[in-house]
């Protein structure tokens, strides 16, 4: 018997080794291309702002309160939280797959065995034996069978298939959490962008109202000049048309304010309400991001990069699990409980019955399917790596572009300030010249149009600077968790 056992084990070992020789090799996880030491040639060493919380980044109390409200009530954040629960449930299921499964059962049956069946002959012969007690005699018409107990089964994870599937689920759970962090950062920046857009629109209304007052006064002056013969009806109509155009623009801006307020209310999950806000766009109210950090910190702080990394690790674990599927599966099973054909003796300790089973199975005619699964998992690992590298490249270039935009927009702001100041003086001069007949009404109209255009351009440049600073905060990983 010992020789037979040795032969069996030897044959089993040879079978496993032969299977192992045919198992494909997995590809190691690739490393992303190294990032440069700095974003620009002029950038120096600095401290990252990625860990700067939005409450410290934005100094506007109304904006901070609005962001808090959005994060607490936005429907997308609640959806993301539910998705995290789903990913956590998948992870728990994978963890449970490594443990034995145990079930409790109760079974009762009755069987009539024919006289020419093995069971029928055996039961008849047993009842004739003098070695059994009366309680052990088997009913022959209907043979009952009662069973109450526990059954257990366990797949032993020798090759790491279940462990790698668990690891894949864990990495995807972490990727889902990063997705929620990415959503949080997006909500913060979107809320702040709309908020500053709203302030800009408020200021635009103020600028238009100021210009309407100026145009009213100019119109009255032209009417007076017409009465004394120094201006024509055409001049009056031109000033009147310009005033009507400015008023129409004002109504359009007010509609934009309503639309922007409604967008913010939508973010908060509200139907109605008001948006409390400051009266001016103050760039100093946003912490300037001169300390934009080292590019390598993107890998640590950007939630989209972290999510892509976890997806890469999950795909590698899937490939390892697909490879492990080529190896034999080892299963253990056991039962323990009470079993008897005599109901009166069912709870007697002598009715305790146990069973222990062990089995091993190896794939033979399934290898095309297994190989296909492995090839798919390997290709998905490559795709995950390329997505990871792509995400890093996109993040780096995004920061470079925003830093360049900030630098150029500062120069734009400086020139726009000069333009507005010059055009403001130009309006005063044109009015004085018109009164003294050294300028025509057309020059006044042109000066007023240029001034209002310059005022709005300066306002939009300030808004753009605020928006790009907000986007840079997000691009560096700020606001994410």
List the predicted regions and their residue ranges.
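Bacterial Sec-pathway N-terminal export signals of envelope proteins
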Residues: 22-95, 202, 283-313, 363, ...
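Hydrophobic, lipid-facing positions within transmembrane beta-strands of outer-membrane proteins
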Residues: 146-152, 294, 354-360
């Amino acid at each position: 018997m010992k020789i037979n056992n040795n032969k069996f084990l030897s044959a089993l070992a040879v079978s496993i080794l032969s299977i192992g020789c045919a198992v494909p090799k997995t590809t190691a996880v690739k490393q992303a291309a190294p990032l440069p030491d700095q974003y620009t040639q002029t950038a120096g060493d600095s401290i990252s702002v990625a860990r700067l919380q939005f409450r410290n980044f934005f100094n506007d109390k109304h904006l901070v309160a609005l962001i808090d409200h959005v994060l607490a009530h936005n429907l997308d954040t609640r959806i993301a939280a539910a998705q995290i629960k789903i990913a956590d449930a998948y992870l728990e299921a994978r963890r449970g797959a490594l443990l034995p499964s145990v079930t409790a059962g109760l079974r009762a049956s009755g069987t009539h065995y024919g006289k020419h069946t093995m069971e029928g002959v055996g039961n008849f012969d047993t009842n004739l034996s003098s070695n059994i007690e009366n309680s052990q005699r088997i009913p022959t018409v209907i043979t009952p069978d009662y069973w109450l107990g526990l059954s257990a089964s366990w797949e032993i994870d020798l090759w790491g298939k279940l462990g790698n599937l668990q690891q894949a689920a864990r990495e995807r759970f972490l990727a889902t959490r990063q997705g929620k962090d990415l959503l949080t950062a997006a909500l913060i920046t979107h809320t702040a962008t709309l908020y500053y857009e709203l302030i800009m629109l408020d200021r635009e209304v103020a600028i238009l109202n100021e210009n309407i007052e100026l145009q009213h006064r100019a119109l009255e002056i032209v009417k007076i000049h017409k009465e004394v013969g120094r201006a024509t009806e055409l001049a009056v109509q031109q000033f009147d048309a310009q005033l009507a155009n400015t008023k129409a623009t004002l109504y359009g801006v007010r509609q934009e304010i309503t639309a922007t307020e409604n967008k913010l209310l939508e973010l908060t999950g509200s139907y109605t309400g008001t948006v409390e806000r400051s009266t001016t766009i103050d760039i100093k109210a946003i912490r300037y991001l001169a300390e934009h950090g080292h590019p390598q910190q993107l890998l640590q702080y950007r939630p989209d990069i972290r999510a892509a990394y976890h997806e890469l690790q999950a795909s590698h674990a899937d490939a390892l699990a697909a490879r492990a599927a080529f190896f034999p599966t080892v299963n253990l099973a056991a039962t323990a409980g009470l079993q008897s054909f005599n109901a009166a003796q069912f709870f007697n300790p002598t009715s305790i019955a146990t069973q222990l089973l062990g089995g091993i199975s190896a794939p033979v005619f399934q290898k095309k399917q297994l190989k296909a699964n492995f090839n798919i998992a390997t290709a998905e690992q490559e795709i995950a790596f390329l997505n990871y590298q792509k995400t890093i490249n996109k993040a780096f270039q995004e920061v470079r572009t925003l830093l360049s935009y900030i630098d150029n927009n500062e120069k734009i702001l400086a020139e726009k300030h000069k333009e507005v100041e010059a055009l403001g003086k130009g309006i005063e001069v044109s009015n004085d010249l018109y009164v003294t007949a050294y300028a025509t009404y057309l020059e006044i109209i042109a000066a007023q149009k240029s001034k209002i255009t310059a005022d709005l351009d300066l306002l939009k440049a300030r808004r753009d600077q605020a928006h790009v600073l907000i986007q840079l905060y997000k691009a560096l990983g700020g606001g994410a968790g």
